[in-house]
Every structure is written in structure tokens, then in C-alpha cells.
Amino acid sequence: MSLNIFWFLPTHGDGKYLGTSDGARAVDHGYLQQIAQAADRLGFGGVLIPTGRSCEDSWLVAASLIPVTQRLKFLVALRPGIISPTVAARQAATLDRLSNGRALFNLVTGGDPDELAGDGLHLNHQERYEASVEFTRIWRKVLEGENVDYDGKHIQVKGAKLLYPPIQQPRPPLYFGGSSEAAQDLAAEQVELYLTWGEPPSAVAEKIAQVREKAAAQGREVRFGIRLHVIVRETNEEAWAAADRLISHLDDDTISRAQASLARFDSVGQQRMAALHGGNRDNLEVSPNLWAGVGLVRGGAGTALVGDGPTVAARVKEYAELGIDTFIFSGYPHLEESYRVAELLFPHLDVQRPEQPKTGGYVSPFGEMVANDILPKSVSQS
């Protein structure tokens, strides 16, 4: 099976070490462009652009990198409750047209109550998933060209529609990750690709089986992906030494403060990540070659595959055998590590190389709109 391999744009910061300003690297637009162009040339299929108050806006970053890349796809965040589903559908179609069909969308419900309150979203975990289901139902139908009336518990729209369609038909794919039962129900009903963070294979297999069963009950099939860091070197010894260096400047106080901050999250996935290491820097290899050191201070994806090229490839194939076809990787610093992954890991995998887009994007295919929603007539129709 050919694998889709994505990289990551560190819009929240980058560096050689975790939890310290030593070795930190300024992340400006030029640096993000370097990483995006490297990923494009090295054969990565796309890049995940993170979202949240610690990150630059993923949509603006993606739009700014369209002109300087050729094949690379951009996986950007949809934020239910933060924006209307109709407006989000218009934005999605525009990004897809401007990128010539290189837009992908990642549904993010949020997990930090403090951040969500700051964004004006005052819903609990269950309510957010209710709102996300309503959002996604509307977003999908609008992008697929339907006129939508919807009267939900959290969202109501009347006459929602899209005048300029996306390049990808019937619409760009929707990605989503979540570990709670409500999240799995949403994935089974609404998304094309279900993402998990890098838990041990046995735990990932259990989640895949649960989502598959729920999707089958609705007559659907869902693809699967996984989000992991990678520390790959020419030898296993060098790789493990690099892992140790990555957290070599972390002190107990920094770890304690990071874990206290992450503990307020109501995300089940974040809780599962934290349980892998328990805030303890001892015994961080939680499964063969799966290292939880990143999660000591980082929210979200907190594990890395560590080893030489053949060893990491063997672990990737273990996940692939579970049904995963998409791997979203990252590494510190992200520019150099993109080359290491491509040079040391890709030769041991069947990597699906992205194709050059064949059709041109457009803004308006039929001239200027009349009034607000009337298509202009040709002379022969007059």
C-alpha cells in the first residue's frame, strides 16, 4: 500500500531543544516558506498547519504559501463555533480554487476551555461535539452545491449556498481527530479520514476498530491517519542520542508547569497522551521505538518514532497494517528534519508522490455577479 506522508509547519515556534530558548529559531514567513518548499521538493504530499492561540492563523499561512509551492497540499483547521459553517464553506472553496485543488480541511473542536472562552465559545465538551456535528453537516452540503436550510440546537441557517464551487469535487476531503465516543460518532458520520495521535499500536488498533464499526453502521467507510514526530538517524544509537538531546534542557519545574497547564484540557486525546508518560521523564519508550518525551511539554501530538531508517520504517509499516494510509510527521528543527526523513526514511517505504495539478484555478467562471446572487446572462440569452 502506498502511503501518504505529510510534514508540519511549526507556526507556534521551532528550535533544537524543547522547553528552552536556547537553540530556538525565529519563525517568520521566510522560514515557513523554506520548510514548505523543502517539503514540496522532497515529495511530502502535504503539510499540517496547526491552529490555536499559540499559532499563526493557518488559513493565512496556507494562502501565503500557495504561490511558492507546486504540488504541496495544505491541511488547515475548521473551527466549529468560532465561525459560521456557511462562511467557512466559502473560505474553503476559495482556498481550494486559489491553490488549484490543494486544500484539505481538519475539523478541530478544541480542547482548552480557557482558550475557547477567550474565543467566545462557552460550550462544554458534549455541547461542542453537538455543535461540530451540526456545523459539519451544513459545511459539507453547502460545499457540495446544495441550498441548505438547517434548524439545529446550536446552529440555524436558511438559504445557505455557495456560488463559486471548489476545484475538488464534490468537495475537498475532511480530516478529523478525537478520542472520545462523541468524536468517534462524528467521524463515522461526517469525515473522510480519521486521525489519531501516536499511541502504541494496540491502542491505535482499538480506536480504528471502533470507528470502522460505527462507520459501517452508517453505510460508510473511513480512511485512517496518524500524527507522529520522527527522530531518524543513520544508526539507532544516534537516533536515541538525538532524542535525549531534544529534552536535555528540560528541568522538572518546566515539566510540572506544562503538565499542570495541559491538565485543564477536557480533550480525551490529550488525557491519553499525558497518561503515556505521567509527567515522568523515566521510561519514556512506551512501545518499541515509540518515545513519549515530546509530550512532557508539548500539547497534542506527544510521541516520536525513534531509530534508523529501517527501524522507523518497520514501525510505520506496523501502523499501516492496521489500516493507516496517511502519516503526518514532524521533527525538531523542522527544516533539517524534513530532509532527514526524506533521505533516511522514504527509501524504505512505498511513498505516494503528489502529482502536479492539471487544471487551473479560477475565481469567477462566468463574469461579475449581478446584484448579490444572479448569474450574468450571455448575449444569446438576452
From Swiss-Prot:
Keyword Nuclease: no
Protein's GO biological process: alkanesulfonate catabolic process
Catalytic activity line of the entry: an alkanesulfonate + FMNH2 + O2 = an aldehyde + FMN + sulfite + H2O + 2 H(+)
GO MF entries: alkanesulfonate monooxygenase activity
Keyword terms: Flavoprotein, FMN, Monooxygenase, Oxidoreductase
Signal peptide range in chain numbering: none
One Pfam assignment: Bac_luciferase
InterPro entries tied to this protein: Alkanesulphonate_mOase_FMN-dep (IPR019911), Luciferase-like_dom (IPR011251), Luciferase-like_sf (IPR036661), SsuD_RutA_monooxygenase (IPR050172)
Record-linked Gene3D superfamilies: Luciferase-like domain
Superkingdom of the organism of origin: Bacteria
Enzyme class: oxidoreductase
CDD domains assigned: Alkanesulfonate_monoxygenase (cd01094)
EC numbers, comma separated: 1.14.14.5
Role description: Catalyzes the desulfonation of aliphatic sulfonates.
Similarity field: Belongs to the SsuD family.
PANTHER family per the UniProt record, alphabetical: ALKANESULFONATE MONOOXYGENASE (PTHR42847), ALKANESULFONATE MONOOXYGENASE-RELATED (PTHR42847:SF4)
Protein name per its UniProtKB record: Alkanesulfonate monooxygenase
